């Protein structure tokens, strides 16, 4: 199987500009870049797709360029946003870029020129505005730019001229690196398609040469929103922001319908193994979730931390690695049950996790209650004597755990 065939089989390919891309990446002849706007001091789960793609391509002999958007971050990418980003100082951007580099080195080999890390501030901040308008601005049609998908939402609430320049700046990045670093391809999220086409067209018009672009499928949460630092629900790669245990638990708790998609797209497990896992059902889906969580935690935090997180999670949720003896617990009696079962609301009140049924209901409806690692679907959920005899672990919010048994 070729590299491109594998990327397709993993569901990573969204759009490509030309079929020439296939031969380039399959034969290790691509020098490609992916851009990272450093709007926070840590990468997030939203960057996972880009990082693992860079690793896959580098393993096949292609050369990655990780472009830190020190210059474009000062403008802000309007793609998929309904408001304007907060402006960052040069000092903030420099600090964030340094943090990014440490995290990227876990995925990409920068030794001996096998990969490059560049900062577009090195060329964007020195541009002469009048020369940019004459030499670059003349290559862009305002009519076409206004039709670009990346501006749709912002047009409704007001698109600043600052943000309107983002496409030109990103296109100039590609143009500059094509000339100075032999960069002939750009990869990015599917929401970047318009910006990426701007770069290939600028190179064609200014240099008369071909450059290529491919978009990868976006990683979205259960509400269909893009995961990462701007769409909420951020899961950070920095252990000081999201601990290895919390990181593990995030992936351990993905929905049944999402687990195989995540394994296929994010891990490096062989496709043959993934195809076999795709037939798993019921309890074996929990095993698949453990595999997903372990593989991704190992990738970010190392095998030792991944093993610790897995053991701790098993102790909390399944008892497979211990009984979580230091966890607060409540012992029920048969008298606490009605017709052999007890509802989640009553259970939470008895365990001291809620002051009233009303508070318990609100927590459940908001999705803040898990039992044995699974989100409680409705306030009407009940637990039988048989379930309670084995002991269950209730999680309220992010940090409150409580064991209940009969």
Per-region residue spans from a language model:
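Divalent-metal (Mg2+/Mn2+/Ca2+)-assisted nucleotide/phosphate chemistry catalytic cores
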Residues: 10, 89-90, 96-217, 221
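A charged helix-plus-loop insertion that forms the helical arch/lid used to bind
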Residues: 78-94
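Short, hinge-like loop/turn segments at secondary-structure boundaries
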Residues: 81-86, 134-136, 230-231
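Conserved nucleotide- and phosphate/pyrophosphate-binding catalytic cores
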Residues: 203-406
